Amino acid sequence: MQFREWTKELFGRKMIVQHGKVAKQSAGSVWVQFGDSVVLATANISDRTIEGVDFVPLTVEYQEKFYAAGKIPGGFIKREGKPSESAILSARLIDRPIRPLFPKYLRNDVQLIVTVLSVDGNTPPDVTGIIAASLALNISKIPFEGIVAGVRLGYVDGKFVVFPTEEQLEKSRLDIVVAGSKDAITMVEGEAKEVTEEEMVNALMVAHDAIKQIIEFEEEILSQFDVQKMEIEEPKPNETLIGKFEEMISEEELRDKLLIKEKLERSAKLKEYRDQILEKIFEDVEMEDDEKILQESLLKEYFDERTKKLMRKIIIEEGIRADGRKVDEIRPITCEVGVLPRTHGSALFTRGETQSLGIVTLGAPMEEQIVDTIMEEGTKRFILHYNFPPFSVGEVKPLRGPGRREIGHGHLAERALKAVVPSEEEFPYVVRVVSEILESNGSSSMATVCSGSLALMDAGVPIRTHVAGVAMGLIIEDGQEVVLTDIQGLEDHWGDMDFKVAGTRNGITAFQMDCKVAGVGEELLKRALQQAKEARMKILDIMFNTIEKPRESLSPYAPLIVTIEIDPMKVGELIGPGGKVIKSIIKEYDVEISIDDTTGKVSIYGKDQKKVNEAIEYIKTITKDIEVGDVFEGKITRIEPYGIFVELMPGKIGLAHSSKLGEDSKNFKEKYKIGDTIKVIVVNIDENGRIQLGKTN
C-alpha cells in the first residue's frame, strides 16, 4: 500500500491527511491532523449479511484516549473503560451526518471507529472525526454515497468564527457544530445565548461556506483513489404479488386509517389492514418458506411506502395532518406544577400524546458533577437527565442504563435550559433536573425542556425566564415545500427533516437539525425558524400562565445553603490541625461545609435551619479577629503555678495570669480544674500574638 499525504491551510490551522502508513488492514483508514489534534478513523465491514433486520447495522465508536491530552485516567483503575458521556455524544455527532449516506438495503455489519490520539484544546477532535470518517468510508470498499464535512462555529463580538479557540468560545454567544455536503446542510447541533432567528440562519450559511472549503480538500484527496465498492443486492418484490397488492389496497380505506388521531389506534388499524391484505395475497401462493418470509417483508415495506406517500400527499395538497391538525398548529398542551409533594420542584408537561414529568432536586456544592475528559476538567453544577422507559410507547423491554439516544436527548435539553440558570453567586445550589417520559409520540426532548423549565420555577430556582422547545418537520414533494410545526412520531419518521428549536421570548438557546434531503436553502430555513418562533411564543404563553415566575421560597424539604465569607488567611484556623475543627462543627451541627480557600467563601449546607444558623455563628466566632475588650466563656485547658490557660475558641488559647484573677488569685489552683468554664476578658495581645486574659464578672 502506497503512503500518501495531503496538506492544506484551513481557518488558520494546517490540516494533514495521511493514508497507507497506519491501520493498513482496515478496509478504509485515514490519519487526520488538524492543528495539534490527531484522529485515526477506521472503517470496516463484515462479509456476512445479517438476516431479519430492516435497518443498516452501522456502529460508530468514538474512543477518547487520555494520553491524547497528556493525562492519566482518574479513579482507582488507570485505564480507559466504557465510553464517557462526552464520547457517546461525539459518536452521535459523527453518526448522524453519515448514516443517511449508506444504501437502504445494506445488511452487513459496518463499524466505524474514530480514535483520538492527540488534542490541543482548541481544535475539536469530534468535528475532525466527521471529516476523517467521510474520507475513511469513501476510500474503503464499503458502499457509501457522498462526501461530508463538519465545522464548529462561534459568534464573538458580532462576528462569526469558524473553529473558535477555547478562549473565544467562553465569550461566544453561539457554539454549534454544523455538518453537510457540498449542496446542503444535513446536521446541526448546538447551544446559544438567546440568538435571533436571523443570526442563526446567517450562522448556518457561514458554516456551510466553510464546509464547502473542506469538501474541496476531500475531493482533491479522493480523486487520487480508484475504489471498487462492494455490491449490495437490492431485494426485488415479486411483481405478481405487487399486482395483487395493488388490486386489494383501497386508498380510501388507507386514508381512513391513516387519519385516526390516536397513535396506538392508528398503528393497530394500519397493521390490521396490512395483515388482512397479506393474508389474502398468500392464500393461493406456493413458495419456499424463506422466499415467503422475504416477500412478506418486502410487501410490508411496500405498504409502508404507500402509506408514507399518502400522508405526504394529504399534507401537500390539503394541508391536513394524520391527527387532523393544520401544518402550523401545535398539539393541545396542559401544564401542571407541584405534582409531587416531597420533591423540591416538579411539573407535568403534556403536549398531545407526549408527556414529560420534570423533577428538580437541589443539592450542596460538594455534590457537583465531576467532569474529567480529554477536553475538559472541572465540575458541573447544573445537570439534566432524560429517561425514556419502554412503557412510554407501550413496549416491553429490559430496563438497563441510559442508551445513546437518552444521553443525547438529555444533553440537548440541558443546553437549552443552561442559558437561564443563575450563576453560583446568585444561587449556590447544585441543580439536577430529571425528565421522566411517561408517554411519547414525538418531540419528547422538547417536552423535557418545557417540563424542566416549569419544574425549575416550581422549585424556586431563580431562572431569568421560561424556556420552551418545539420540533419542526419538512415535507418536500414535486417542488412544493411544507414546514410542519410540532411534529409527531409519524411525521418525524416519514418527513424530510427534523429540527428542534428551544429558546426564550428573546431568542434561541438550543438547536438541533437532521435533514434527509438535499437542497434546504436559506429561504426555507428562514421560514422554518420563523414558524418555530411563532409556535414557541404560544407554548411560552401557556407556561407563563401556569407559573409566571420562580417561587419566592424553596420547598421545606429542600436543603438550606448559606454562604458567608471569611478572611482567606483564617481558612486554616477553620479547618484546624488534621481537619479537627471542621470535623467537629460538621458532627456537632449536622451540616456539610465546603470551603474555597482562595476566596474564603464558606458554604454551610443542612436540613435544620436552627442548626445551620448555629453553625454559621460558631464559624464567625472562631474566624473573627480577637481584640482587646472581647469577652469569652472559655474552657480551662491547663493550670500552672503562675496562672491558667483558657481556650477561647478552637486553636485560640490565652493566659489568665494569677494576678488577673481578682479574688481568686491566691487559691485559683484549688478553685479551678481542667475542663471548667470561666468568663474572661482580653486585656492585652502582645506583638507575638499572645493573648493575655483577666477574669470578669
Curated annotation (Swiss-Prot):
- One Gene Ontology cellular component annotation? cytosol
Catalysed conversion reaction: RNA(n+1) + phosphate = RNA(n) + a ribonucleoside 5'-diphosphate
Give the UniProt record's GO annotations in the biological process aspect: mRNA catabolic process; RNA processing
- Per its UniProt record, what Pfam families does this chain match? KH_1, PNPase, RNase_PH, RNase_PH_C, S1
Answer yes or no on keyword Metal-binding: yes
User: Membrane: is it a keyword of this entry?
Assistant: no
**InterPro entries membership:** ExoRNase_PH_dom1, ExoRNase_PH_dom2, ExoRNase_PH_dom2_sf, KH_dom, KH_dom_type_1, KH_dom_type_1_sf, NA-bd_OB-fold, PNPase
Alphabetically list the UniProt keywords.
Cytoplasm, Magnesium, Metal-binding, Nucleotidyltransferase, RNA-binding, Transferase
Tell me where in this chain the S1 motif domain is found.
Answer: 629-696
Q: Tell where it localizes.
A: Cytoplasm
- Residues noted as binding Mg(2+) in the record, renumbered to the chain: 492, 498
Q: Where is the KH domain?
A: 559-619
**According to its UniProt record, which cofactors does this protein need?**
Mg(2+)
Q: What is its EC number?
A: 2.7.7.8
Q: Name one GO molecular function term.
A: 3'-5'-RNA exonuclease activity
- Record HAMAP family: PNPase (MF_01595)
Q: Tell me the PANTHER family matching this sequence.
A: POLYRIBONUCLEOTIDE NUCLEOTIDYLTRANSFERASE, POLYRIBONUCLEOTIDE NUCLEOTIDYLTRANSFERASE 1, MITOCHONDRIAL
Per the record, the similarity remark reads: Belongs to the polyribonucleotide nucleotidyltransferase family.
Give the function comment from the record. Involved in mRNA degradation. Catalyzes the phosphorolysis of single-stranded polyribonucleotides processively in the 3'- to 5'-direction.
Tell me the protein's name. Polyribonucleotide nucleotidyltransferase
Q: Which organism is it from?
A: Thermosipho africanus (strain TCF52B)
